[in-house]
Amino acid sequence: MTSNNGIIMNLDNQYLIDINEKILKRHAKIKKVKVYIETTKNIDLVIPKVNSVGNSGNRKEDLIEKVACIMAVIPWAQAFFDSNRRTGIIAASKFLYDNGYELEIDPDNENLELRGMLSEIKKQSQTLNQDLMKQLSFYISKRIKPL
């Protein structure tokens, strides 16, 4: 599906479920631990929330806003029993790739910063904290690069 500003939106609940399952199976294999691959009813909050943002008509700004939303809504909504932050990061990266961009993130230092922001977002109970969303959007805007 493509929006009016040319943004390709190939994310749906099943795609997110598949990403989460792959992450958890890999984790189980590497760590030799039992994992629980389950979704919650909150998964139904993710795609409508992503579709509600990034509709200004400025493609790059809209992409950044949607990527921030994908990364934030999954851990905030606790769409899965485990690996919500990792699922959000990978789904957002795939979304960017589909739209001709990538995030340049140093796997050591910057990933910790990103995971810290997503942890703070997860702690919000009622609504997404707009200050944290702006901080996340700024973080993404400094690291988004064309393929």
Language model features by range: what are they?
Residues 1-147:
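FIC/Doc superfamily catalytic core
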